[in-house]
């Protein structure tokens, strides 16, 4: 074992009692006893719990430095691991020396002083908030989920593909995109029609930040069979809500020779895999969320893992909602996009389990979703989870060129703008499917937090791009 083990390694028993180590971290709290001892709670972020260091007053720098330590000071505490007589901790560190690496300039004005801070306040000091129990736990859970996603797809034979962040394509056809340009805003070049001449821009045409890696992912799925993307995406929606971000991460698998049923099975397997991983690897953080944020966090994940996914056609789901007797805020009729209240009723009250709603009306779904034989619906699906509603959206992709072209025209898109996407249907077309998982929504579900801005390090939202 290294002379500098992490606190996680020490507390998990990987360091033997009696071994001398040096712990590097930051002071959470200092407590002094009348017996001439000081107790330092030191954390390094490797796990939720700090380690307690016992400092005797015979250390040479005890009076001048140890007694001045406050929350946030960085230290290297060298000592021996001993069994702890106190409840709640198996071992502690009997210090032989304390080296102060960095002081907190003014403890009275330190933004992360040892007290409870509101979540709203923490957003104002996003550069310091990972030092709190809450955001530190979120960061570790986020890492665990990301690693589990990569492991799952690797084990399933999927290849990770890096899709571009700068694009000329609007995957959703919604137009809510951030433009990328190097043109001088004070002196825009214009054509004879008075419109901005983007041929003089950096890329020689209009370009945007991507809203999805899906279309690019499909190109590789039609060559490598099974691929996935995992990266940032951007939406210029002017939505200042607890559910929306302008910059967020998406997980988007695409696989060839796959039907909508295959897609639903992959989504179920992936969610259960990552939930098992976080329950096994981050129980310490989940217990914190269970105690302080949402007391159903752990049981909800366990119930999800042990539940069989229900499946229902959109048309039948509308019937269920109409017959429910519920007075929904948004009226129910065939052709609407299900709102959050509709989704949660289906998952939480009707099925009491995760549910896949499939075969939605074509007019409320994207152009690339495969048209069903009825001509009215597409082979789309949403995975609804108790406690949050939609967590995954996907579809079987339209592999027939003539149908794809017709759908594009219906939705006001120019097929020629998607010439490369159409080529996939011209050269060895194949049925294929995929879905999108909003990574931050997954973290919200796992942690029980109510605002999506708490689960990404530096949230980007309307009129908010600090740090």
Swiss-Prot record:
Cellular localization per UniProt: Cytoplasm
GO cellular component: a single term: cytoplasm
Record key words, sorted: Aminoacyl-tRNA synthetase, ATP-binding, Cytoplasm, Ligase, Nucleotide-binding, Protein biosynthesis
Gene Ontology terms for molecular function: asparagine-tRNA ligase activity; ATP binding; nucleic acid binding
E.C. no: 6.1.1.22
Superkingdom field: Bacteria
Reaction equations catalysed: tRNA(Asn) + L-asparagine + ATP = L-asparaginyl-tRNA(Asn) + AMP + diphosphate + H(+)
Enzyme class (EC, first level): ligase
GO biological process: asparaginyl-tRNA aminoacylation
Family: Belongs to the class-II aminoacyl-tRNA synthetase family.
Quaternary structure note: Homodimer.
NCBIfam families: asnS, PRK03932.1
Protein name: Asparagine--tRNA ligase
């Amino acid at each position: 074992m290294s002379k500098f083990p992490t606190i996680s390694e020490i507390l998990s028993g990987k360091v033997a009692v009696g071994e001398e180590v040096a712990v590097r971290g930051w002071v959470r709290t200092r407590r002094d006893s009348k017996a001439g001892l000081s107790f330092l709670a030191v954390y390094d972020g490797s796990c939720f719990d700090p380690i307690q260091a016992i400092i005797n007053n015979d250390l040479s720098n005890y009076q001048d430095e140890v007694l001045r330590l406050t929350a946030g000071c960085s230290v290297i505490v060298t000592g021996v691991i001993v069994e702890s007589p106190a409840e709640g901790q198996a071992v502690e560190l009997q210090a032989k020396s304390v080296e102060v690496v960095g002081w907190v300039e003014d403890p009275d004005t330190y933004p992360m002083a040892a007290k409870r801070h509101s979540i709203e306040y923490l957003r104002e000091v996003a550069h310091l908030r990972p030092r709190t129990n809450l955001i530190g736990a979120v960061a570790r859970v986020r890492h665990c989920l990301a690693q589990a996603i990569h492991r799952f797809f690797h084990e399933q034979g999927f290849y990770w593909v890096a899709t571009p962040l700068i694009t000329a394509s609007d995957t959703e056809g919604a137009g809510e995109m951030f433009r990328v340009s190097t043109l001088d805003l004070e002196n825009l070049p214009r054509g004879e029609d008075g419109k901005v001449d983007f041929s003089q821009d950096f890329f020689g045409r209009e370009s945007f930040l991507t809203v999805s890696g899906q279309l690019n992912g499909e190109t590789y799925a039609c060559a490598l069979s099974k691929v996935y993307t995992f990266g940032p995406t951007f939406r210029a929606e002017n939505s200042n809500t607890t559910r929306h971000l302008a910059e967020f991460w998406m997980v988007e698998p695409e696989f060839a020779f796959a039907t909508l049923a295959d897609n639903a099975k992959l989504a179920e397997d992936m969610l259960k895999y990552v939930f098992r991983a976080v329950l096994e690897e981050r129980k310490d953080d989940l217990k914190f969320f269970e105690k302080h944020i949402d007391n159903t966090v752990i049981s909800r994940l366990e119930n999800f893992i042990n539940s069989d996914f229900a499946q229902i056609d959109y048309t039948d789901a509308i019937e269920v909602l109409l017959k429910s007797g519920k007075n929904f805020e948004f009226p129910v009729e065939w052709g609407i996009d299900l709102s959050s209240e509709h989704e949660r009723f289906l998952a939480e009250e009707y099925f009491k389990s995760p549910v896949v709603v499939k075969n939605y009306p074509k007019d409320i779904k994207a152009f690339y979703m495969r048209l069903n034989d009825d001509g009215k619906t597409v082979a789309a699906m949403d995975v609804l989870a108790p406690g949050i509603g939609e967590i995954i959206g996907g579809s079987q992709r339209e592999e027939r060129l003539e149908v794809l072209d017709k759908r594009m025209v219906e939705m006001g898109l120019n097929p020629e703008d998607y010439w490369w996407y159409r080529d996939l249907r011209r050269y060895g077309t194949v049925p294929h499917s995929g879905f999108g998982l909003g990574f931050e929504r997954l973290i919200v579900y796992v942690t029980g937090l109510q605002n999506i801005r708490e689960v990404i390090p530096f949230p980007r939202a309307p009129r908010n791009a600090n740090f």
